[in-house]
Amino acid sequence: MRLLALHVHDFRNLPQVQLTPSAHATIAVGQNGQGKTNLLEALYFLATLKPLRAGRLSELVRWGSQGARVTGRFLLKGAEREIAVEVGGGTRQAFVDGKKASSLEDYFGGVSVVAFTPDDLEVVKGGPDSRRGFLDRAVFNRFPAFLRESREYARALKNRNRLLREGHTVDAVYLEAYDETLAKAGARIYSRRRALMAELAPRAQATFASIGRTVDPAVYNYRPAHLEGDFAAADETALAAMLRESLSARLRRDMERGFTSVGPHSDDVSVTLGGRSARAYASQGQQRALVLGWKIAEIENLEAAMGFLPLLLLDDVSSELDPERNAYLMGYLAQSGAQVVLTTTDGSLVRGAAADDTLWLDVHGGQVAVRADAEPPPAN
């Protein structure tokens, strides 16, 4: 897979951007607040239909404009394909080769990206919600249908919570119907997460062993809370039954609190180092190495599953890594042959990922300019 062309119109602070990215590294350099992260987010939004940062869709539209549009032309398995997404009025529309996409699966059609941001480096010491989001982005990259499936679960959860807030006046028959819907949708989420972890965790653990600077082994694990039974061996039907049982057992508590306390939305990813919680006991450098190991494993896992490398998006990550681990990452990017778009405030930090065909960009005040020379711009 290769991104051949990118056109961005009125996305965040970017009025117009037209690029022919390098087949290898495209590096955007600029000070904070100038728009380099917005360029990366435009690409991420194009490939996933989800913003890279939390917020409303309306925030993606440049101030004073009616709508935003991002268009990308890709080479996929020898054939060119154009996808586009428009945002306006708080909604988004997706297009494939100039026509409205018939489904999410039709839209994605093999386009895959892996994003790596400074916020990701804080995942290990963050809260469960950040680790769930981190896991679910990886699940979506591996199984694009997960976007639709997670939305189905979110709708079912919202409906059940609405009924729970009615307290003891709620009709048990209605609640049972919502429990059934939620259990089936939740079982699918469990199954997707479990499948991804089975593929990715061993790779991440092996990568960490080479960069962690410790003999302590890393273990990444996902095991839902409040489920009784053999999670590892259960099929989706059994998982749904396990979730239904947990929903029933916690019904009184849920009615008192007005929300659903069990399900995929309340789970966590366990990361341990030498058998101890990495969140509590690992150093900051080790925590970041654990995340770096995960991201490299995600890239390698997607290549193994799809037969090609995803597009890589790195947002000023180098400034947050120590020199040794940054050198490891830059060397990996250069050797992998992947197409990568990086942002940085200092071009010297990412020189290790550059090649003769690297496209260097200067970003200032929402304007993106291609540098005529091949040398990285000096640090300011």
Swiss-Prot record:
MF terms in GO: ATP binding; single-stranded DNA binding
Which GO biological process entries does UniProt record here? DNA replication; DNA synthesis involved in DNA repair; double-strand break repair; SOS response
Q: Which UniProt keywords apply?
A: ATP-binding, Cytoplasm, DNA damage, DNA repair, DNA replication, DNA-binding, Nucleotide-binding, SOS response
Q: Where in the cell is it found?
A: Cytoplasm
| Transmembrane spans | none
Residues that coordinate or bind ATP: G30, Q31, N32, G33, Q34, G35, K36, T37
Q: What cellular component GO annotations does this protein have? A: cytoplasm
For this UniProt entry, what is the primary localization, expressed as one broad class? Answer: cytoplasm
User: Cross-referenced NCBIfam families, in alphabetical order?
Assistant: recf (TIGR00611)
PANTHER family xref list: DNA REPLICATION AND REPAIR PROTEIN RECF (PTHR32182:SF0)
Similarity remark: Belongs to the RecF family.
Functional description taken from the UniProt entry: The RecF protein is involved in DNA metabolism; it is required for DNA replication and normal SOS inducibility. RecF binds preferentially to single-stranded, linear DNA. It also seems to bind ATP.
Protein name, per record: DNA replication and repair protein RecF
Q: Which organism is it from?
A: Myxococcus xanthus (strain DK1622)
